[in-house]
């Protein structure tokens, strides 16, 4: 189906999902979550040290700092994500209303996380700002076609939610945990919108959606690839168990692609769609094996540490 045809076919679904979202989401204010009482002036020219951090008596390592930096910079890249999603869905009707509402909600995330990081001095503010300038100046974001966009957005929002929540759990600081929990709750509602939208698209155009699903599962990458030194940060994040291969398979691919979308049970596929389904099932089986090996190696390393 052409993009205009599937968007028209899915408009009632988008309207229903938008109404569900608006009736479920709760108003909140970033300033309510920022511990301003811990804040003090940042003197220009001073060099940040981990000892400067005030995390309510808790300490964090470089893995959690990398996660905080990547999580915030991902949210800071919102202008480009807005551009991408608006290009996919358009400006009119429920589609445009959703894009603008999603953007407004996402905007609060960077405000809350940034406020927490600046008042607590959890990470180096100079490194953070230089990384933000580099990333946003580059404007690097995924730019999938419509059918793949349905898949990517659902997987990406869930991955972001998991990353935020796991980061908060490792902070130790109850205030920081609440910040990341609040942001993660928004991301969960967003992924529900995209997940169910993708499910409806599969019913309408199963063949093209199966091809899109296989491609996105094969090539999926967390947002943030434009962040300076992203590979090093991603390795630290995986080492801490915030987001790794096991989590990606067990908490994203298996529950969404297999259980929610029932990728292995979709019927009525043509040659290309059936071939994509076969490749997808093989890839998911490989992903499961890799996830198990990753977990075994990590557990062995922890046992000998």
List each model region and its residues.
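Non-heme di-metal
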Residues: 1-305
């Amino acid at each position: 189906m052409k993009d205009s045809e599937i968007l028209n076919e899915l408009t009632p679904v988008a309207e229903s999902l938008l109404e569900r979202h608006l009736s479920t989401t709760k108003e909140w204010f970033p300033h309510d979550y920022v511990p301003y009482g811990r804040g003090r002036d940042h003197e220009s020219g001073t060099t940040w040290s981990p000892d400067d951090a005030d995390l309510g008596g808790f300490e964090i390592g470089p893995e959690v700092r990398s996660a905080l930096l990547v999580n915030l910079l991902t949210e800071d890249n919102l202008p480009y994500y807005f551009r991408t999603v608006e290009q996919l869905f358009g400006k009119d009707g429920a589609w445009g209303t959703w894009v603008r509402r999603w953007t407004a909600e996402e905007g609060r995330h960077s405000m809350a996380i940034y406020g927490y990081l600046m008042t607590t001095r959890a990470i180096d503010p100079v490194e953070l700002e230089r990384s933000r300038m580099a990333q946003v100046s580059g404007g690097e974001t995924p730019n999938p076609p419509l059918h793949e966009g349905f898949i990517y957005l659902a997987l990406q929002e869930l991955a972001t939610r998991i990353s935020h929540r796991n980061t908060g759990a490792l902070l130790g600081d109850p205030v920081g945990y609440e910040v990341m929990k609040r942001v993660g709750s928004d991301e969960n509602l967003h992924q529900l919108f995209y997940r169910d939208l993708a499910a409806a698209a599969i019913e309408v155009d199963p063949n093209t959606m199966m091809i899109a699903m296989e491609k996105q599962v094969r090539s999926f990458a967390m947002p943030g690839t434009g962040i300076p030194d992203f590979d090093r940060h991603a390795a630290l994040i995986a080492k801490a168990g915030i987001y790794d291969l096991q989590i990606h398979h067990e908490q994203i691919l298996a529950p969404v692609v297999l259980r929610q979308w029932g990728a292995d049970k979709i019927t009525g596929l043509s040659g290309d769609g059936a071939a994509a389904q076969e490749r997808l099932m093989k890839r998911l089986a490989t992903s499961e094996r890799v996830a198990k090996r990753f977990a075994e190696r990590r557990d062995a390393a922890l046992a000998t540490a």
